[in-house]
């Protein structure tokens, strides 16, 4: 089974959502990407359709935007 990818920016809202996602779907089923520290993954997230973080991209390619922490434009600086 392919993993979901959870993108976030490292803020407290995002880290809280990360813990909830891991609890809900299991650590083995999700790859966590902190865009704040892995800036080289911004283009990947945008290509997947992520407009803001935190967001979960499902194995089927659906983007679930969770709450609102920061826009991708904000993360680019």
Predicted segment positions?
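Generic alpha-helical secondary structure signal
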Residues: 19, 39-43, 73
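Residues that form or flank phosphate/diphosphate-binding pockets in enzymes
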Residues: 15, 40, 66
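Glycine-/small-residue-rich active-site loops that bind phosphorylated ligands and cofactors
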Residues: 12-13, 37, 63
